[in-house]
Amino acid sequence: MSSDKPKAAKAAADLPEDFPRGTQLLFNPLYNRGTGFSAAEREAFGLWGLLPPRVLSMEHHAARILENFYKKPTDLERYVYMIGLEDRNETLFYRILIDNLDTMMPIIYTPTVGQACQQYGHIFRRPRGLFISARDKGRIADLLKNWPNDDIRVIVVTDGERILGLGDQGANGMGIPVGKLSL
């Protein structure tokens, strides 16, 4: 562990000054690794005491997630569980998605995403995507500035109509572009 300390300290020093640390890092799904942070990383990023002391591998995390995934009684509950994981730890989410694509594809996208769209108001956890309505006419440029990332490589758009043959889902159709981007 002590040999990791200089590397982690250097890596932390090379990061931008505004890089999240402490609880901000743990609540950032792009960078959070939960108990996967090494002891040296915990020291460098101000995580000491914020996590259980044992460091667990990505494989251990993935096995635990899959164990809980299979305990969910319905595909919609599996969908909500996986989206919750994506909200906490994107690296682990995509690792599980890639390693278990045949199992995850029908959960993250069709057919389960259709049911997720129909239940969107009941399973909504946090905003995903950018909602633009007719009321935003004339202010779309300002609205686009609210997106938190500058590095945008792909955009998926829907008007919420005819979602998977389910009819007009309106804002509840956001599950379709989010699901497409996940895959």
What is the predicted function of each stretch?
Residues 3-183:
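Metallocofactor- and cofactor-centric catalytic cores in central/energy metabolism, strongly enriched
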